[in-house]
Amino acid sequence: MIDYDPTRPKWVQIYEVVRARIESGEYPPNHLISEVQMESEFHVARVTIRKVTAQLREDGLIITTPGMGSFVASKKAPGND
């Protein structure tokens, strides 16, 4: 669990933690991003976690496959946009 800053939305703070884990390699490509696990770890409601995953998806950090779940996206090679 993290110490939340009451002046900022919780979902933004959780997003920053998860993004940092992805960027550091703690969550490698194809790692399952479990909403249930994040709910438990961060002690927040599912709707909050869904905001986090929506932003991660929009930023291209995760890919969601219906019926399978959300997974860390493979990193792009430098210069390949």
What is each of the regions a protein language model found here?
Residues M1-V44, R50-A54, E58-I63, M68, ...:
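Extreme N-terminal segment that seeds HTH/winged-HTH DNA-binding domains in transcriptional regulators
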